[in-house]
Amino acid sequence: MLILLETMAEERRTATAPELLEPLMARLAGGDQEALAELYHRTRTSVYGLALSYLKNQHDAEDVTQDAFVRAWENAHQYRPQGTPLAWLLTIARNLALMKLRERGRTQDMALEDWERL
């Protein structure tokens, strides 16, 4: 069992290796939809895991994951290889998750205020 888990972890590290993701980012910046599909395939678990760790809600984490890849598609031309492509993508997902949490807080505050008015 431990060997299987170690193998899976190694496969995940290999799938998100910067030397594999960098060319995808260049293709993505050129509008290559297949590059987006491959980037999604290689990084979706990491992006979803980060979103879920912030949001603690599967539905919201799925929304943030989808939105992160949409933003990556729209802004790939702005990617600068100062870090890794995965770090860039996770930063997008983190920012979207934080926005979702702030939005959730405002909604809850409004509902509480409405409740107190009754």
Question: Where do the language-model regions lie?
Answer:
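Intrinsic, short, N-terminal disordered tails of RNA polymerase sigma-factor systems
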Residues: M1-G30, E34, E38-H41, R106, ...
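Active-site phosphate/pyrophosphate-handling residues
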Residues: P23, E34, S46, D67, ...
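Helix-turn-helix/winged-helix DNA-binding modules
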Residues: G31, L52-S53, R80-P81
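Amphipathic, Lys/Arg- and hydrophobic-enriched alpha-helical face
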Residues: Y40-Q58, N75, L90
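A short, glycine- and basic residue-enriched loop/turn
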Residues: R44, Q58, E62, A76-Q82, ...
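Structural recognition of an alpha-helix C-terminal capping motif at a helix-to-coil junction
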Residues: G49, D63-V70, G83-N95
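Arg/Lys-rich amphipathic alpha helix in sigma70-family domain 2
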Residues: E74-P81, T91-L112
